[in-house]
Amino acid sequence: MTGDRCVVCGTSTHRPADACARCRRILDRVETRRDASGGLRRVDAAARLRALAGSWRDGAFRCYYTGVCLIEDHSRWRDHRYLVFEDRIPGDGASVVVTCALVSRMKADLTEDQFKLIVTELAKVFNGGTFDQGAFPDQPHAGTTRRPPA
């Protein structure tokens, strides 16, 4: 608790609040993603706080992967630049970073290294090259039976 400054962005706040209203709204978002077995994912609140604070640069939240300025207004949740939390290691809430919705959807259940490899191979195709199919990761969820959402 800092008393009069937001621990994320440094904006003035009131005692005993640790985060300003804007940052608190982001930190308190309800997790709707599900794990491989269909259960709701657990949120690592401390990791999310670190990720959000780490993404704050030059007066804005920035995407971990692209550095672009993110949109935090919930009414614009369908925008590709909307701020979301993303696990660098799928299912590991402690590895969470702040990213844009588009990158999060593209990365989905890939690790950071797998994502970089796929994007690099895709760029080769865009430049007239050939995609190396060896870049596809093994199927991490093969044999996993998903429960339908409750």
Regions found by a protein language model. Name each.
Residues 21-27, 77-91, 114-122:
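Short cysteine/histidine-rich metal-coordination sites, predominantly Zn2+-binding motifs
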Residues 48-50, 61-102, 107:
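Histidine-centered nuclease catalytic patch
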Residues 93-150:
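A detector for short metal-coordination/catalytic motifs
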Residues 14-19, 73-76, 108-112:
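Short Cys/His-rich "knuckle" micro-motifs
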Residues 2-7, 38-53, 80-87:
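Short Cys/His-rich Zn2+-coordinating modules
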Residues 26-62:
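Short, charged surface segments at domain edges that flank catalytic/cofactor-binding sites
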Residues 2-5, 16, 55-61, 93-96:
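Short metal-coordination and nucleic-acid-contact micro-motifs, chiefly zinc-binding Cys/His arrays
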Residues 1-29:
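BZIP DNA-binding basic region
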